[in-house]
């Protein structure tokens, strides 16, 4: 039985995610306990084949509008709310899966999944984007130097359900409003959110490999 990881391909940086997952499969196939495959997802028929879904960075407003206008929103909503499925939202994807937005909330109809409040464009305009070396070794073994790229990135301003949502990583400092810069979190063991772009870490698949091992394979084996 093959475990299928889908990458939502309505808009955004989906090809980079596909390539990183493909690289994980090629380099680590002997260490994964299940056979894996990856595919792009543009409609409900493709989504129905998936065990996990990565929602990429891009433009959350465009993503939301495309899903609604094509009649895909309800299928996405049902998928991500299914506890047997795994969901990972990166940057715009994190915005799209969150329950609340603190700004520009009328522009995005979210999937109302991750129990947090998110601030869009917390790092300013694209010219202010940057790559920061982050120590993720508290949750990814030996990953103390990951190049995390933030592009007009959101942050989690508030965790609405601390019982089920675990903060994985905060950047040093605070935003202009005095809020902590929470940039990675998980909900239970099947929902992951990152405000940065692990798929833009060239030739570095550590984050995707961890996602596959800790979310996809563990959830599938239940």
UniProtKB/Swiss-Prot annotation:
Q: Which PROSITE patterns match?
A: PDXT_SNO_1 (PS01236), PDXT_SNO_2 (PS51130)
Recorded catalytic activity of this chain's protein: aldehydo-D-ribose 5-phosphate + D-glyceraldehyde 3-phosphate + L-glutamine = pyridoxal 5'-phosphate + L-glutamate + phosphate + 3 H2O + H(+); L-glutamine + H2O = L-glutamate + NH4(+)
UniProt keyword list: Glutamine amidotransferase, Hydrolase, Lyase, Pyridoxal phosphate
Question: Any one cellular component term from GO for this entry?
Answer: cytosol
GO terms classed as biological process = glutamine catabolic process; pyridoxal phosphate biosynthetic process; pyridoxine metabolic process
The pathway noted for it is: Cofactor biosynthesis; pyridoxal 5'-phosphate biosynthesis
The active site is formed by 91 (nucleophile), 197 (charge relay system), 199 (charge relay system)
Q: Which GO terms describe its molecular function?
A: glutaminase activity; pyridoxal 5'-phosphate synthase (glutamine hydrolysing) activity
Q: Where does L-glutamine bind?
A: 58-60, 120, 151-152
What top-level branch of life does the organism fall under?
Eukaryota
The EC number on file is 4.3.3.6, 3.5.1.2
Q: CDD domains annotated for this entry? A: GATase1_PB (cd01749)
Q: Does the keyword Lyase apply?
A: yes
Q: Sorted alphabetically, which InterPro entries does this protein's record hold? A: Class_I_gatase-like, PdxT/SNO, PdxT/SNO_CS
The text of the family note is: Belongs to the glutaminase PdxT/SNO family.
- What does the UniProt record say this protein does? Catalyzes the hydrolysis of glutamine to glutamate and ammonia as part of the biosynthesis of pyridoxal 5'-phosphate. The resulting ammonia molecule is channeled to the active site of a SNZ isoform.
Q: Which PANTHER family match?
A: PYRIDOXAL 5'-PHOSPHATE SYNTHASE SUBUNIT SNO (PTHR31559), PYRIDOXAL 5'-PHOSPHATE SYNTHASE SUBUNIT SNO1-RELATED (PTHR31559:SF0)
Q: What is this protein called?
A: Probable pyridoxal 5'-phosphate synthase subunit SNO2
**Which species is this UniProt entry from?**
Saccharomyces cerevisiae (strain ATCC 204508 / S288c) (Baker's yeast)
